[in-house]
Swiss-Prot record:
Keywords: DNA-binding, Metal-binding, Nucleus, Repeat, Transferase, Zinc, Zinc-finger. GO terms for cellular component: nucleus. It comes from Arabidopsis thaliana (Mouse-ear cress). This is Putative RING-type E3 ubiquitin transferase C3H69. One of its GO terms (molecular function) is zinc ion binding. It catalyses: S-ubiquitinyl-[E2 ubiquitin-conjugating enzyme]-L-cysteine + [acceptor protein]-L-lysine = [E2 ubiquitin-conjugating enzyme]-L-cysteine + N(6)-ubiquitinyl-[acceptor protein]-L-lysine. It comes from the Eukaryota. It is found in: Nucleus. SUPFAM superfamilies: CCCH zinc finger (SSF90229), RING/U-box (SSF57850).
Length: 350
């Protein structure tokens, strides 16, 4: 057994350094499970923190390194206390060594204080089950401590198959199920999208050369698959003389159904509800971006009320949308665009 302290990240199954970690990854080594944020008074987890909220005793620093006076025979008292509270620690491993070979990260006095506080706070009647953290080793698949683990072993999630559901936190358990099911559906949709080919270039969309090309261009009125580059090139072509834009460029190249806009997406939908969700999320994202044509009220957006971007003024006020309905001679009703005085003044030659 080494003389290093047990890595607190390894104890919770979250050490990323592995064999290169400067702390011990041996369960026989002593632990120092004190919350450092609690010592500073800024722990935001409170009673739900997985680390101990106790006041650690700190060694008194000496005036200078040359005048430091060692404590009278600390080895025997420290060994006795450590062996009493840590049965797995042998006295031969706690023999005094030169101070130059030790790192001042912890001492036996603080370890004894931690053990005393742990004994005082280990009364099961003082800690509620919902306040205990879930064992990350059991959630990952196997806990080496088994029934002696101080943390709670969760129940199995029916979607991901991990023991990560806290049995005493119903809200957290339901939230995990919803998030897990959503991620599972996204992975299934991404798996199905790998085989979808573009109807124009006949290539697999997600197998394109560059990441910018690995997107689908969804049309609102039909379910034909196109890559974003092909459908945008189709709709941006210059129409011939006398050609109707709506019936040629804005229509689907396959079924000729009219779609007014294209929605980029990294996955392909398998149901109408999924397509609607993708389009709603796309519109919601654009609403948070300021329109460059509107320019906080200083410009004029050619799309008017049909613009998906945010029309906000310098003071944060949103543009009030007022639709003007005009009745035509044939009985149809059309929506007129906003007419500004500046449009007339620009055409006047004064």
């Amino acid at each position: 057994m080494s003389k290093r302290i047990l890595c607190k990240f390894f104890a919770h199954g979250a050490c990323l350094k592995g064999e290169h970690c400067e702390f011990s990854h041996d369960w026989k080594d002593p632990t120092n499970n004190i919350c450092t944020y609690y010592q500073k008074g800024i722990c935001s987890y409170g009673s739900r923190c997985r680390y101990e909220h106790v006041k650690a005793s700190r060694p008194h620093p000496s005036a200078s390194s040359s005048s430091a006076v060692p404590r009278p025979s600390p080895a025997s008292a420290s060994n006795t206390l450590a062996c009493a509270f840590l049965p797995g620690v042998a006295e031969r491993d706690l023999s005094p060594v030169p101070s130059s070979s030790l790192k001042p990260t912890w001492n036996l006095d603080s370890l004894h204080q931690d053990s005393v506080d742990e004994v005082k706070t280990s009364n099961p009647g003082t800690v509620k089950p919902e306040e205990l953290p879930i064992c990350s080793f059991a959630a990952a698949g196997d806990c080496p401590r088994g029934n002696e683990c101080p943390h709670i072993h969760g129940t199995i999630c029916p979607t991901c198959g991990k023991c990560c559901l806290h049995p005493f936190r119903p809200d957290e358990r339901e939230e995990h199920k919803k998030v897990c099911e959503k991620k599972h559906k996204q992975l299934e949709a991404l798996k199905l999208s790998q085989e979808i080919e573009c109807c124009v270039c006949l290539e697999r969309v997600l197998s394109k050369a560059t990441p910018a090309e690995r997107k689908f261009g969804l049309l609102t009125e039909c379910d034909h698959a196109f890559c974003i580059a092909c459908i945008r090139n189709w709709r941006s072509s210059s129409p011939s003389t006398g050609m109707d834009v709506n019936s040629t460029l804005r229509a689907c190249p396959i079924c000729r159904k009219l779609s007014y806009f294209v929605v980029p997406s990294v996955i392909w939908f398998s149901a109408p509800e999924e397509k609607k969700e993708i389009m709603d999320n796309y519109r919601e994202k654009l609403r948070s971006i300021d329109c460059k044509h509107f320019s906080f009220g200083d410009g004029n957006c050619p799309f008017g009320t049909s613009c998906f971007y945010k029309h906000a003024y310098h003071d944060g006020r949103l543009e009030e949308v007022v639709l003007r309905h005009l009745d035509a001679e044939d009985g149809q009703t059309v929506i007129a665009k906003d007419i500004r005085l500046s449009d007339f003044l620009e055409n006047m030659h004064i």
